[in-house]
UniProtKB/Swiss-Prot annotation:
Function recorded in the entry: Catalyzes the conversion of 3-deoxy-D-arabino-heptulosonate 7-phosphate (DAHP) to dehydroquinate (DHQ).
Name of the protein this chain belongs to: 3-dehydroquinate synthase
Keywords annotated in UniProt: Amino-acid biosynthesis, Aromatic amino acid biosynthesis, Cobalt, Cytoplasm, Lyase, Metal-binding, NAD, Nucleotide-binding, Zinc
One Pfam family here: DHQ_synthase
Gene label: aroB
Amino acid sequence: METIHVDLAERSYPISIGAELFCNPAHFSSVIPAKKRVVVISNVTVAPLYAQQIIDTLNTFECQVSLLELDDGEQYKNLDTFNQILTFLLEENHSRDVTIVALGGGVVGDVVGFASACYQRGVDFIQIPTTLLSQVDSSVGGKTAINHPLGKNMVGAFYQPKAVIIDINCLKTLPEREFAAGMAEVIKYGIIVDREFFDWLDENMDKLYALDHDALIYAISRCCQIKADVVAKDEKESGMRALLNLGHTFGHAIEAEMGYGNWLHGEAVSAGTVMAAVTAQKEGLISQSDVERICSILEKAKLPLKAPKEMTVDAFMKHMMRDKKVLSGKLRLVLPTSIGSSEVVTGVSESVLAEVIEQCKA
């Protein structure tokens, strides 16, 4: 098992990464006191697979546990689901000493984290991510949010969990399409800051898709370590944390325009990463060979390289100008400058962006 620490002074917390963690009380009792009231919140897909294991483990130190199952899908990461959680907590008369466990993928983690941040001005919560994407990205760092019809993650808060518990055995029940979506975020880390990790991924893609234990532990641990280091330096995304959004400005536009859930987040990020790389090449920031390597590894990971053909330039620009990185009306893009290096760029012209969008559509 690997343990990584997110260093945020009094709000620091551990990330535990291994196998068979759900049945080990030690991973829970270190952050949840005995006899505590606990609410496990999952979705209708994940709860039947893993909720009872966790409830049984919590019962070993006499926690009082209740379970809430949410609908499954990005389209449910909304105000209605947020209110459903708050209503459940109120109807069960939970006070500020409750601990909430978010069991599921990125949607569950985001909406449950946001509800935890808001309920009685903040209660403890633990992230138990069950998808590759949530294990390497969304469960770590304290970003919580729900979507708005006009934009993704537009309503939310920075709110850190008390712990993150990652059991790689969950990936055995994950559909390959979802695994591939997670690989988009894994590859992102190599592109933005770690060329050596990028090279390792390129060489070990088959092992990862075969769910090789050691390969998964290494890849997930490396992603979490990179993110933990970035978050420790820039928790509220005032500087370098923005680099973690490579591909997301274009990608969020795809998700919003095509309807949440029709394109998986990682699929949209993959197409968005290609668009960012092509933009960087047109701006003279990255070599053609590095762009080709980025496209090659995404294709090897069974991810889309092209944006949907029906999306117009106007549709992209409408959504991109609502991006949270926009400052003073100016679009800021995370662009790779080489494999292992990236920067935030302001001032890419609309004509260049229009060229990129047309070039990168299916």
